[in-house]
Amino acid sequence: MRAEYKDAEALTELVGIIWHDTPEELTEIIRSYMASDDSAVFAEKANGEFIGVALCGLRRDYVEGCDTSPVGYLEGVSIREAYRHRGIARKLVAECEQWAREKGCTEFASDCELTNTASLDFHLHIGFSEENRIICFRKPL
């Protein structure tokens, strides 16, 4: 289901599993995804509590392996541990993919950390193909 603005605080803990900003920052990030026409938040509930969340958006800059623009992009998916391996993440990603199709996208992409083998396995299992591996650098000026 498409999450609503009023759900942002309740989703903060779930998003905090994958992103390590402060709870206040996470709530604002979630709200910004909900407020934009270029992004969406989908969530799943069980027994009255949120057990899964997926955030997606449109990327108009270069996306590894993609030839079109915009590209639908899975920004993050998080499932409570007790509910993993039940198809919930797959369902949420499918909702993101449908949203991207409705936005005119013909490609859908994502990423994960090089060391996150569980995420890599999940992506491959639901039909993504690995396009590239990179290491990012920075230095102060």
Protein language model regions, located:
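Conserved GNAT acetyl-CoA-binding A-motif
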Residues: 93, 100-112
